[in-house]
Amino acid sequence: MAAPNQVNNNVIYFNAAAQTLLTIRFRIKAIVWVSSEGAGLDIAADDDMLLSDGEGNKIVGKRAEAAGQGLELALPGGLDVMGLTATTLDGGVLYVIGEAL
């Protein structure tokens, strides 16, 4: 499995399914799933997104009901996880924002 792009200690960027980062402890503060037209990674109707922790436990998932319908989810208290996997990412890009622990 390929690794996602870790932009810095605060942002992890997934642009394909099955990208895994198992060796990081991370406090998730926000999750953003958006289209990236320039990269040809648009969200289409019925596209699915599923983010899991390193043990395969579901963190969040969503099915787009219309084209371009992503997700912006804030977790004010944060959610501590060990490892991250974009289990399903049919379209768009996924940003996981928080801090490495």
Labelled PLM ranges:
Residues 1-101:
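Surface-exposed, low-hydrophobicity beta-strand/loop segments enriched in small/polar/acidic residues
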